[in-house]
Amino acid sequence: MLSVATRSGPFAPVLSATSRGVAGALRPLVQATVPATPEQPVLNLKRPFLSRESLSGQAVRRPLVASVGLNVPASVCYSHTDVRVPDFSEYRRLEVLDSTKSSRESSEARKGFSYLVTGVTTVGVAYAAKNVVTQFVSSMSASADVLALAKIEIKLSDIPEGKNMTFKWRGKPLFVRHRTQKEIEQEAAVELSQLRDPQHDLDRVKKPEWVILIGVCTHLGCVPIANAGDFGGYYCPCHGSHYDASGRIRLGPAPLNLEVPIYEFTSDDMVIVG
């Protein structure tokens, strides 16, 4: 008896097995098919018999791009002709679409365009930032009602000569004094060497007959009393500071003269403080 066994390996898709019976004294290589008896089970011929040969018949038999050798693992790579190659021409500039031309020829034009876009963008961003900063700063400024209280108009004809009138301005007392000619001459004759905070009377007034001061003592913030004290000006009852008719400190613990606010005479009979 002769038996042969072999493995086709990667050649299985192209090989097929056949057998032929020859009469002789030896045992046939393939036994003859015996009809099945009713007692034996009949195979379901409609169900495909899975084997290497049947599966190889179902394999795709298209042109191969790459084949395998005898001593390497079997693999098949097919050529795909339906794959679309990406094309980015729509996103590229016209100057660099031609691959046969050097990009140096159009570098100046492309750089100029880039600089132009950068410059326009920078100007736009700066303008937008300016508007944002302006709105932010404006939001922190005083409102209209606060600005209205920032200035006060005073009618000078309501203040008699030699008298002092007190007004409320920005939450502080405001002294407006109508000085006599004697007070004007007296304060102008004071030597600066006698003053703790040296300042001439003419430097503190715009018109000699009118003295405008903030009525807050420079020591601890008390409100002085007008037409009182040793110098006939203002006197702070808290700690005994004496000011003259020009608001200059003459005696007591106060270190500085009374503050002179910003004011302007709009007419002979009207002054605006603030």
From Swiss-Prot:
Subcellular location: Mitochondrion inner membrane
Enzyme Commission designation: 7.1.1.8
Miscellaneous section: The Rieske protein is a high potential 2Fe-2S protein.
Record's catalysed reaction(s): a quinol + 2 Fe(III)-[cytochrome c](out) = a quinone + 2 Fe(II)-[cytochrome c](out) + 2 H(+)(out)
GO CC terms, sorted: mitochondrial inner membrane; mitochondrion
Cystines in this chain: C222-C238
Maturation and modification: Proteolytic processing is necessary for the correct insertion of UQCRFS1 in the complex III dimer. Several fragments are generated during UQCRFS1 insertion, most probably due to the endogenous matrix-processing peptidase (MPP) activity of the 2 core protein subunits UQCRC1/QCR1 and UQCRC2/QCR2, which are homologous to the 2 mitochondrial-processing peptidase (MPP) subunits beta-MPP and alpha-MPP respectively. The action of the protease is also necessary for the clearance of the UQCRFS1 fragments.
GO terms of biological process kind: respiratory electron transport chain
Name of the encoding gene: UQCRFS1
The protein's name in its UniProt record: Cytochrome b-c1 complex subunit Rieske, mitochondrial
Residue ranges, Mitochondrial intermembrane side: 141-274
Domain Rieske per the UniProt entry, residue ranges: 187-272
Family, per entry: Belongs to the Rieske iron-sulfur protein family.
Note accompanying the cofactor annotation: Binds 1 [2Fe-2S] cluster per subunit. Fe-S cluster delivery to the Rieske protein is mediated by components of the iron sulfur (Fe-S) cluster assembly machinery that reside in the mitochondrial matrix (including HSC20 and LYRM7).
PROSITE patterns the UniProt entry points to: RIESKE
Ligand binding ([2Fe-2S] cluster): C217, H219, C236, H239, S241
